[in-house]
Amino acid sequence: ASTFKWIVRTKAASNGLYADFSPKPLSVYPGNGMHINISANKEEKMPAIMAGILAHLSEITYFLNPSEESYSRIGQSKAPKFICWGTQNRSCAIRVPSKHPNGKIQIRSSDSECNIYLAFTLLIYAALDEKKKNLVPEPAVQENLFQSYAEDKKDYEERTKNYRTIPLSLAEAR
């Protein structure tokens, strides 16, 4: 990831431009996420892997989103706010692509400020935790949580009160 960023920044500079990979470089536009895709060669293992990651996502958010700026995109402009999963649902912290409903997941909360090696280590640890605890994920969220907030803010709080939220600040993530 570092080499890629260096190449893009160098190429941009040589053309009189500036490339910025920070989580929220412009406050009026959506930010930059760094979605992490995970595949399992045994599809039947993916629900347990996902359950482990969901169980630990709150405590590893500090490492997936390590700067104050990281939290300016969480829950805003298409970045997830809730620790949940859904098939083809971009409003959830974990999205299961419809083309691979059992073998792939996408972690949508992380951003480019994270140390990718540490992020992968923590995600692997969280995924393996299911072996000890026999975790099972909650049912998938079908509702588009971005759209429901825009449509009815009063009812939104009632419908989402049972979802855990991703920490909304660096201090909360600690």
What do the predicted segments below correspond to?
Residues 8, 22-41:
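Histidine-centered divalent-metal-coordination microenvironment in nucleic-acid enzymes
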Residues 1-4:
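Active-site acidic/histidine clusters and adjacent loop/turn architecture
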Residues 7-19, 42-174:
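C-terminal accessory/tail domains of diverse enzymes
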